[in-house]
From Swiss-Prot:
UniProt protein name: Probable nicotinate-nucleotide adenylyltransferase
GO annotation (BP), single: NAD biosynthetic process
Gene that specifies this protein: nadD
Gene Ontology MF terms: ATP binding; nicotinate-nucleotide adenylyltransferase activity
NCBIfam families cross-referenced by the UniProt entry: cyt_tran_rel, nicotinate (nicotinamide) nucleotide adenylyltransferase
Keyword NAD: yes
Keywords from the named record: ATP-binding, NAD, Nucleotide-binding, Nucleotidyltransferase, Pyridine nucleotide biosynthesis, Transferase
Pfam hit, one: CTP_transf_like
Function noted in UniProt: Catalyzes the reversible adenylation of nicotinate mononucleotide (NaMN) to nicotinic acid adenine dinucleotide (NaAD).
Pathway membership: Cofactor biosynthesis; NAD(+) biosynthesis; deamido-NAD(+) from nicotinate D-ribonucleotide: step 1/1
InterPro entries: Cyt_trans-like (IPR004821), NadD/NMNAT (IPR005248), Rossmann-like_a/b/a_fold (IPR014729)
Keyword field contains Repressor: no
Catalysis: reaction(s): nicotinate beta-D-ribonucleotide + ATP + H(+) = deamido-NAD(+) + diphosphate
EC number annotated for this UniProt entry: 2.7.7.18
Length: 180
């Protein structure tokens, strides 16, 4: 009987990570998740909910309710997994989450973000390490494309590690929804 070789020749599972406070989760998050799955043939997308975005004011809604609402928004889209990892990872840093999820090296990770986040991505903790360990999938948001294409991150990254998706389906942000 021939024994299978170790994992060297096995294809990695492609997953996406969409991180944020999801305060609140909305159909824009759902639509970019669906597009990312379709374009890249991702098996799953993790909505990695954080207690607090280090670049924004305190979240208005408590974590438990944000998780509950995010699960409601995804409905029957079972490829999306709503997760809170900070207690397991002991950090809210993106690089620590990526290292945690890929400790067994079995995933090809795509980190999903809006063009507005790309503008200041160079301020994220160990941003260059994030780009070395995963691909960035950036969705255009109205009014942000030109600025994001001039950003420190865009100009300093290997373009093979970054895909820019023109996306006009939904133009809403959690910040705008909170103002309503």
């Amino acid at each position: 009987m021939v024994k299978p070789e170790n994992n060297l020749n096995q294809k990695k599972t492609k997953i996406g990570i969409l991180g944020g406070t999801f305060d609140p989760a909305h159909k824009g998050h759902l639509e970019i998740s669906k597009q990312a799955k379709k374009i890249l043939e991702l098996k799953n997308i993790i909505w990695a909910i954080t207690k607090q975005n280090p670049f924004k004011n305190t979240s208005k809604t408590d974590l438990k309710n944000r998780i509950k609402f995010a699960k409601k928004i995804i409905g029957k889209n079972n490829f999306i997994k709503v997760k809170f990892y900070e207690e397991k990872v002991l950090s809210n840093k993106t690089i620590d989450l990526i290292n945690y999820l890929n400790k067994d090296k079995k995933f090809e990770i795509y980190f999903i973000m809006g063009a507005d986040n790309l503008i200041n991505f160079h301020k994220w903790y160990k941003w260059k390490s994030i780009i070395k360990k995963c691909n960035l999938l950036v969705f255009d948001r109205q009014g942000y494309k030109a600025k994001s294409l001039k950003s420190v991150t865009y100009n300093g990254v290997n373009k093979n590690r970054l895909s820019f998706i023109n996306f006009k389906k939904v133009n809403i942000s959690s910040s705008q929804l909170r103002k309503i």
